């Protein structure tokens, strides 16, 4: 193999590596991320969407009953991988989302608390969506 052919093949290989890296970087966020295990609050829900919604709501109300500490709720949600809590007009929320190639799933916890940091209301919402 001549020096020119080796040089040409090296350039082609570098271009291919660059192209593949660019494509992977561009579409990384669209790759499935469901390979991570679900946190305890979201794991093990029934296959039926209606039942799963009810079970998640019950699970959240049982784990964080009205009157419990808001800070404990926020710390546990953060430790379980839920996003930073949002707030609007005294109502707080934190969500966890998972996606695969066709479906997405979202678990959201919403709550209100009094001035002393105790929960006055708490709800859990599970929303599966497949296109």
Give short role names for the model-derived ranges.
Residues 70, 83, 117-120:
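Short helix C-cap/helix-to-loop transition motifs enriched in small/turn-promoting residues
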Residues 101-131:
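Amphipathic N-proximal alpha-helical interface segments
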Residues 74-110:
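A cross-family detector of function-defining hotspots
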Residues 43-75, 80:
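Terminal, regulation- and interaction-focused segments at domain boundaries
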Residues 20-58:
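Compositionally biased P/S/T/G-rich terminal and signal peptide-adjacent segments
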Residues 6-26:
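Hydrophobic membrane-insertion alpha-helices, especially the h-region
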Residues 1-5:
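Short, Lys/Arg-rich N-terminal segment immediately upstream of the first membrane anchor
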């Amino acid at each position: 193999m001549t020096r020119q052919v080796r040089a040409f093949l090296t350039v082609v290989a570098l271009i291919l590596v660059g192209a593949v890296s660019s494509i992977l970087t561009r579409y990384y966020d669209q790759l499935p991320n469901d390979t991570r295990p679900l946190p305890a609050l979201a794991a093990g829900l029934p296959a039926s969407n209606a039942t799963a919604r009810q079970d998640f709501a019950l699970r959240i109300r049982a784990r964080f009953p009205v009157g419990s500490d808001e800070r404990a709720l926020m710390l546990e949600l953060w430790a379980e991988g839920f996003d930073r809590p949002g707030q609007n007009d005294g109502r707080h929320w934190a969500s966890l989302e998972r996606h695969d190639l066709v479906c997405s799933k979202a678990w959201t916890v919403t709550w209100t608390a009094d001035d002393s940091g105790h929960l006055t209301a708490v709800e859990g919402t599970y929303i599966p969506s497949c296109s």
